[in-house]
Amino acid sequence: MEETILQTEFDSVSRQTEVGHSFKRKTQTIDIEGYTTELVERDGILFAKKESEISYPKDGNETFFKIEESSFWFNHRNNCIVEAVKKYCPNNHFFDIGGGNGFVTKGLEENGIQTVLIEPGVQGCLNAKKRNLKNIICSTFENASFPNNSIPTIGLFDVVEHIENDSDFLKSIHTLLKEDGHVFITVPAFKSLWSNEDVDAGHYRRYKLKDLEHKLKNAGFTIEYSTYIFSILPAPVFLFRTIPSKLGLYKKSNGNDKHKNAHKPKKGIIARVLNRIWKFELNRIRIGKKMPLGGSCFVVARKKWA
C-alpha cells in the first residue's frame, strides 16, 4: 500500500520534470548496491520500501529550488562545504543526507567528490534529477537500511535542527559511519536568534557551537574542526526576524516571495562587502581557523576508533 501511494505521488510529480543544468564535471554513477540492497529503482531514482514523516514544509524543496542557484546564502554555504570536504576527506564517497534538491550534491560533484543524495521528499529527488545527478535515493537514511559501519562520509546540512531527538539521531549517524569516518554538519546558530521563521521552517532548535560539539562528543565523535559561518548575519536576523517575532509583528507572507527577497543577489557596495566577507570566511576554513560569530554553525567530526 505504501509503495502504491509513493508511486502515485512520483508519477504525478514526475510529469512536471524538465531537462536541468549541465555539470562542470560529469557525474559518475556509484554502485549503491555495494551499500544497501533494500531499495527499488524507478526512472533513475532509488526508493525505500516505506516512508516516514519528516519535520519540513511540504513545499520547501520546490520553494528553494527556484532560488538556490542565485542565492548568496546557498552559494556561500556550498563553497564552505566544498572547502572543508576537500581539506578533510576528498577521496571518499560522500552521502548527503536530507540533501533536498541536490544543490550541495551538485557542488560536491562539480569539485570531483563522488556524492550520493539521500532525500525523503519526492519533489526534491525529482529536482535533483533535473540537475543531472545520478546517485539519488528517495528515503530517510533509516528506511534505506544501510548496514552499521558502512558509510565513509556523511553530510547533514541544515538537517539536525529538524530532528526532535537530535542526540539519538547523532548516535545513529555514528553507528552508520565506518571507523574513522567523517560527518559534516551545518545548523542555524544561537537560540537568541529564534523567530517565527524557525517555526515555519520546522526547526526544533538553534545551536551554540559548543552545545553541538558537546552532543557530538557524547555520540562518540571527536571534533576535527568547528566554526561559525555567515559572520555578518546575526545582527540583521535579530533586527528583522527575532525582534518582530517577539513583538508580535511577524506577518506570514507568501513563502516564495519571502524567500526570494531574502536570498536575492546583492548589488553594488553591498555585494562587494559581502564578497570580501565570504572570501575571508573561506580562507579561514581553508587554513583551519575559527570564526567567533555567525548565523550558522559548521562542524567536521570524526568517528573515533573503538
What are these regions (language model features)?
Residues 1-149, 153-157, 168-170, 268, ...:
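Conserved N-terminal segment of class I S-adenosyl-L-methionine
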Residues 236-276:
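C-terminal helical/coil "lid" or tail adjacent to the Rossmann-like core of SAM-dependent
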Residues 163-167, 187:
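A structural helix-start
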Residues 89, 109-110, 164, 178, ...:
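Short conserved AdoMet
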